[in-house]
């Protein structure tokens, strides 16, 4: 699967770890940055190009990181056809529902909150869970205005 990935300085180390993990699993990873640590960088500079890339390729997904993942999801969701969901811990069912009911195509995670040892299971789950379709399709269509 083609996966776009992006972060600001807050998630740089975790992004690099996730990128290596995904590549080892055979995914094609497009890294939109950040590529070096700069505590003054701005997350929209990396997140928006990532979200645009996902919006242009319906078969791809995106993983974005930041301190909390909230601002990053807000930025990504400004792009038409993007449905970014935030996860920073808690029940795995939340991640499943983002795919089953919302067809989330970007997973936004809070690097300062999520435990690294749990992140790979969450990513694997999010990548494998299909969209249910059905009654959820009409709801998603109402979002792209």
What are the residue ranges of the model-derived segments?
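Short active-site oxyanion
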Residues: 2-3, 59-62, 81-84
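C-terminal binding/interaction regions
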Residues: 4-6, 10-11, 92-145
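Glycine-rich phosphate/diphosphate-binding loop of Rossmann-like nucleotide-binding domains
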Residues: 5-24
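Short, conserved beta-strand edge motifs with alternating hydrophobic and charged residues
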Residues: 6, 30-33, 62-66
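A short beta-strand-loop structural module common to alpha/beta enzyme folds
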Residues: 28-40
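Short, structured active-site "lid" loops
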Residues: 46-64
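Mid-chain, well-packed structural core segment of small domains
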Residues: 65, 70-108, 112
């Amino acid at each position: 699967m083609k996966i776009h990935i992006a972060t600001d300085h807050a998630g740089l180390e975790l992004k690099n770890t996730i990128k290596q993990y995904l590549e080892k699993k055979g995914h094609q990873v497009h890294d939109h940055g950040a590529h070096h640590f700069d505590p003054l960088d701005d997350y929209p500079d990396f997140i928006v190009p990532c979200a645009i890339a996902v919006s242009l390729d319906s078969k791809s997904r995106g993983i974005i990181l930041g301190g909390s993942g909230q601002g990053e999801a807000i930025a990504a969701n400004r792009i038409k056809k993007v449905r970014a969901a935030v996860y920073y811990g808690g029940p795995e069912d939340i991640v499943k529902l983002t795919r089953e009911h919302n067809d989330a195509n970007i997973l936004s995670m809070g690097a300062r909150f999520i435990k690294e040892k749990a992140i790979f299971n969450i990513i694997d789950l999010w990548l494998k869970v299909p969209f249910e379709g059905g009654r959820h399709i009409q709801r998603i269509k109402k979002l792209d205005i």
